[in-house]
Design a protein with these regions (language model features):
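Short intrinsically disordered, low-complexity coil segments enriched in acidic
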Residues: 1-8, 136, 176-180
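Loop/helix-junction capping segments adjacent to catalytic residues or to phosphate/diphosphate-binding pockets
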Residues: 23-24, 48, 95
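Short acidic, glycine/serine/threonine-rich loops at helix termini
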Residues: 26-28, 52-55
Length: 180
């Protein structure tokens, strides 16, 4: 999915692969890819779990928690001379992360405007954002109202919801949106 998004945004994707949960193999793969890439993007392995190989293998990168949902765990830095972005493994979290971090990076590298188009549209259904996190909800616009593309506005594993997504609805921390 991330490779397809990057391609749609004008990047030449050099490789897209699954790497075993081995720190040595993962780091060697990153070293090989970094020699032929300007940007290295990973998905999965960036939180605090026992099998977070990305975090273990690239301990010189920054891994942090961002006050956002979905996509709270993130990684970034420079691996060799290559920009590194480490996204969560949940598909919706990865999609949101790519929209917020990879797309502007690629646009900046191409010399294009990095601003997202922002419009205010009434909510077409009710939802609450979590306390202390900005929520980015994959959504669609129907009859002038924004509606989440999945039934529960928050399931980062609901990849099928992305097929209908045409926008990201943004609700700042602790916002209660009511349908109009």
């Amino acid at each position: 999915m991330t490779a397809a998004l990057a391609t749609a945004w004008g990047a030449d994707v050099v490789g897209c692969m699954h790497v075993p949960d081995s720190p040595d193999i993962f780091r060697a793969t990153c070293t090989d890819l970094a020699q032929q890439s300007d940007v290295l993007v990973t998905s999965g392995g960036v939180s605090a779990g026992a099998f977070d190989v990305v975090k273990e293998s690239l301990d010189d990168m920054t891994f942090t928690k961002v006050a956002m949902q979905p996509g709270k765990p993130q990684g970034f830095g420079r691996f060799r001379d290559t920009v590194f972005l480490g996204f969560p493994g949940n598909p919706v979290s990865c999609y949101v992360s790519a929209q917020l971090f990879l797309r502007p990076l690629l646009r900046r590298m191409a010399g294009a405007d990095t601003n997202h188009t922002v419009v205010q549209i009434p909510a077409g259904s009710n939802w609450r954002s979590p306390l202390e996190r900005t929520q980015f909800v994959p959504a669609m616009i129907i009859d002038g109202a924004v509606i989440p593309t999945h039934v529960q506005a928050g399931g980062s594993h609901l990849v099928a919801s992305l097929a209908a997504t045409t926008a990201l609805a943004v609700a700042v921390s602790y916002t209660h949106l009511r349908a109009h």
